[in-house]
């Protein structure tokens, strides 16, 4: 009798499950033969990122407490596992973070770290298992009052990068390492300053040289050289991140005094974010004294340890300002850095040269940055104007220009260039200046369109 009573309930449950399965969305379209990353969205994911079903784009992972295990559910994020259809943390013990807070588990700490990266660029790391000791919150303790070096490192580390130069072997397709070093981020859009010898090589082997840049949070990008001066040993390289990056500011090396505390940070022997400290031994050491006969530079001498791989990394003062680029080690306790005033001059010359180049390259549009006030103004004139929060509004297309020939029209909204979201018109100008081909994602009415534009060089 009891088995007969359970049968209707079981059938009802199966029927409900069948309806649930049938009610799901139909399967997605088959994977493309070739991934077009310019079509990938740029999600902000509290639960982290995972590859999509086609292993082409990054999509949001399921966060703790979200459903999982069904065909259309996203995989669980980092340190999570699917337990009875719900994402749960693999570990249940409390942990102490570098921000001084106690977290219920590792997953809660990682979620806080992702939020912190988006806000300040500084991740939260695990200090220890268990709750934080009470001393972490006692900001008047000697540990917190006098650890000024740690304060500087915490401020500058997110903007220091590791750089590797490879040679792509033409026959075997393998990357042969040529050199490695460090650099620091100068602009939120991805401009990086380093040494010229870090990003160039005299190796005569055939093959294509490639630059790889790794950020503190583990993100890696391919980089291109923007400008290089081998005599002064300064170079700038460019990456194309999908979000704004933390930056360092240049100080005035002319104000340096012998005896000042300085901090050197870089990647000696590929050990990323290695910190050494010291003082300024001499603020102006003539390059000719170092045996550099053609030198016209006065170097900063410091006793901060600089090893192979530190080259290109920043030498900073206690305010976190860059006062030099770590360049040369002569002996233990005797190292040298290119002064920041020389870097400033190099960047100014680079900017002047590129402004001239900008006048020679154009795509032929008059544009305005999308702002809430501009959207309101355009919606007043055209109620069907799309609801957009960022991008570039095409006010006018120049006749017979690359944009007109490529299909751009008045009133279009350019939302991405080469897969990167556009927030300001200067970002499109920079792309016109630095990239030979532009893949523009355009919003026209309710349609999203792709156009390939080749900037024109005016002699």
Curated annotation (Swiss-Prot):
Any one of the GO CC terms: extracellular region
Signal peptide: 1-23
GO MF term list: endopeptidase activity; identical protein binding; serine-type endopeptidase activity; serine-type peptidase activity
Residue span, PDZ domain: 365-450
PROSITE patterns (alphabetical): IGFBP_N_2 (PS51323), KAZAL_2 (PS51465), PDZ (PS50106)
The entry's keywords: Disulfide bond, Hydrolase, Protease, Secreted, Serine protease, Signal
Residues covered by the Kazal-like domain: 76-134
Enzyme superclass (EC): hydrolase
EC number, as in UniProt: 3.4.21.-
Residue span, IGFBP N-terminal domain: 27-90
Ranges for region Serine protease: 181-346
Sequence intervals crossing the membrane: none
Catalytic residues (UniProt): 197 (charge relay system), 233 (charge relay system), 311 (charge relay system)
Disulfide feature: 31-54, 35-56, 40-57, 45-60, 68-82, 76-87, 89-107, 96-132
GO biological process: negative regulation of BMP signaling pathway; negative regulation of transforming growth factor beta receptor signaling pathway; proteolysis
Tissue expression notes: Expressed in the ovary, essentially in granulosa cells in a follicle-stage specific manner. Highest levels found in large luteinizing granulosa cells.
InterPro entries, A to Z: Growth_fac_rcpt_cys_sf, IGFBP-like, Kazal_dom, Kazal_dom_sf, PDZ, PDZ_sf, Peptidase_S1_PA, Peptidase_S1C
Pfam hit, one: PDZ_2
Known function: Serine protease that cleaves beta-casein/CSN2 as well as several extracellular matrix (ECM) proteoglycans such as decorin/DCN, biglycan/BGN and fibronectin/FN1. Inhibits signaling mediated by TGF-beta family proteins possibly indirectly by degradation of these ECM proteoglycans. May act as a tumor suppressor. Negatively regulates, in vitro, trophoblast invasion during placental development and may be involved in the development of the placenta in vivo. May also have a role in ovarian development, granulosa cell differentiation and luteinization.
UniProt subunit comment: Homotrimer. Interacts with TGFB1; the interaction inhibits TGFB-mediated signaling. Interacts with BMP4; the interaction inhibits BMP4-mediated signaling. Interacts with TGFB2, GDF5 and MYH9.
Protein family membership: Belongs to the peptidase S1C family.
Name recorded for this polypeptide: Serine protease HTRA3
């Amino acid at each position: 009798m009891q088995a007969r009573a359970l049968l209707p309930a079981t059938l009802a449950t199966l029927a409900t499950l069948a309806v649930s399965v049938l009610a799901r969305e139909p399967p997605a379209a088959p994977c493309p033969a070739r991934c077009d990353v310019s079509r990938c969205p740029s999600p902000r994911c509290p639960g982290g990122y995972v590859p999509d079903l086609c292993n082409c784009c990054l999509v949001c992972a399921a966060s703790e407490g979200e459903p999982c295990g069904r065909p259309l559910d996203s995989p669980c994020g980092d340190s999570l596992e699917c337990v009875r259809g719900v994402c749960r943390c693999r570990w249940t013990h409390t942990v102490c973070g570098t921000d001084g807070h106690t977290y219920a588990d590792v997953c809660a700490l990682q979620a806080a770290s992702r939020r912190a990266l988006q806000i300040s660029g500084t991740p939260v790391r695990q200090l220890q298992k268990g709750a934080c000791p009470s001393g972490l919150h006692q900001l008047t303790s000697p540990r917190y009052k006098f650890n000024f070096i740690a304060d500087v490192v915490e401020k500058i580390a997110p903007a220091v990068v590791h750089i590797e130069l490879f040679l792509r072997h033409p026959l075997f397709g393998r990357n042969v390492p040529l050199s490695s070093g460090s650099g620091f981020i100068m602009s939120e859009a991805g401009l990086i300053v380093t040494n010229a010898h870090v990003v160039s090589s005299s190796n005569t082997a055939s093959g294509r040289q490639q630059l790889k840049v790794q950020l503190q949070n583990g993100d890696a990008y391919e980089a291109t050289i923007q400008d290089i001066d081998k005599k002064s040993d300064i170079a700038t390289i460019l990456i194309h991140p999908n979000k704004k990056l933390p930056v360092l500011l240049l100080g005035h090396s002319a104000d340096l005094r012998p005896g000042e505390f300085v901090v050197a940070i870089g990647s000696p022997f590929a050990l990323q974010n290695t910190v050494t400290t010291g003082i300024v031994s001499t603020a102006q050491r003539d390059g000719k004294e170092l045996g550099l006969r053609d030198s016209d530079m006065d170097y900063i001498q410091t006793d901060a340890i600089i090893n192979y791989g530190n080259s290109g990394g920043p030498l900073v003062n206690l305010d976190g300002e860059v006062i030099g680029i770590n360049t040369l080690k002569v002996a233990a306790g005797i190292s040298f850095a290119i002064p920041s005033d020389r870097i400033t001059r190099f960047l100014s010359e680079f900017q002047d040269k590129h402004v001239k180049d900008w006048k020679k390259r154009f795509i032929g549009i008059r544009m305005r940055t999308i702002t809430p006030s501009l959207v309101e103004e355009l919606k007043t004139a055209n109620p069907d104007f799309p609801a957009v929060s960022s991008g570039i509004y095409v006010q006018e297309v120049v006749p017979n220009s690359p944009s007109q020939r490529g299909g751009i029209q008045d009133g279009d909204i350019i939302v991405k260039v080469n897969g990167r979201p556009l927030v300001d018109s200067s970002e499109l100008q920079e792309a016109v200046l630095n990239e030979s081909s532009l893949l523009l994602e355009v919003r026209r009415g309710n349609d999203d369109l792709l156009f390939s534009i080749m900037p024109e060089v005016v002699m």
